[in-house]
């Protein structure tokens, strides 16, 4: 009897077959995969007007939970891999206690609290930085966009009359 597939090796002592797969993707296909994260950021930008005065929003642009939103409405908001963090970022690239977002003198600061991989604002490493609307904060593999609402005491443009 002749073997029909001479190129395939068979282990005579086992019925296991090993199959390996290689995937190749077009660059435009990969950019389509990023589209939902970008769309989520755009919808968050349009919803920023509804934020309470003195608060801000962090939107995950890249990372395992892209599109997630975190409201910054406390004096200090912690971010890290520890389950007790206000912003829980579950990935090994994030330290247990990675960074804090602090509201001081009507502006938000991000402070690295001794993380292993560092905290970045607009791709620059920082120990502490004042955040401006649209800044990108990187914590581990997560990239978050910082969006501000109206500042405390600012008029939102609405009138009190009919």
UniProtKB/Swiss-Prot annotation:
Activity control summary: Phosphorylation triggers an intra-molecular protein closure, which blocks the FHA binding site and interaction with target enzymes, and switches off the regulatory function of GarA.
SMART domains named in the record: FHA
Outcome, altering residue 95 to A: Decreases ability to bind to and regulate the activities of Gdh and GltB, but does not affect ability to inhibit Kgd
GO CC term, one of those recorded: peptidoglycan-based cell wall
Pfam families: FHA (PF00498)
Keywords: Acetylation, Phosphoprotein
GO biological process annotation, one example: regulation of cellular respiration
Residue positions where Phosphothreonine is found in the record: 21-22
Annotated Gene3D superfamilies: 2.60.200.20
Post-translational modification: Phosphorylated on Thr-22 by PknB. Phosphorylated on Thr-21 by PknG. Phosphorylation at either Thr-21 or Thr-22 prevents binding to target enzymes. Phosphorylation at these two threonines is mutually exclusive in vitro. Could also be phosphorylated by PknD, PknE and PknF.
GO molecular function terms attached to this record: identical protein binding; molecular function inhibitor activity; mRNA binding
CDD domains (UniProt xref): FHA_GarA-like
Origin superkingdom: Bacteria
Domain FHA positions: 77-126
N-acetylthreonine modified-residue sites: 2
Physiological role: Involved in regulation of glutamate metabolism. Acts as a phosphorylation-dependent molecular switch that modulates the activities of Kgd, Gdh and GltB.
Assembly information from the UniProt record: Monomer. Binds via its FHA domain to Kgd, Gdh, GltB, PknB, and the N-terminal region of PknG.
Protein name: Glycogen accumulation regulator GarA
Organism the protein comes from: Mycobacterium tuberculosis (strain ATCC 25618 / H37Rv)
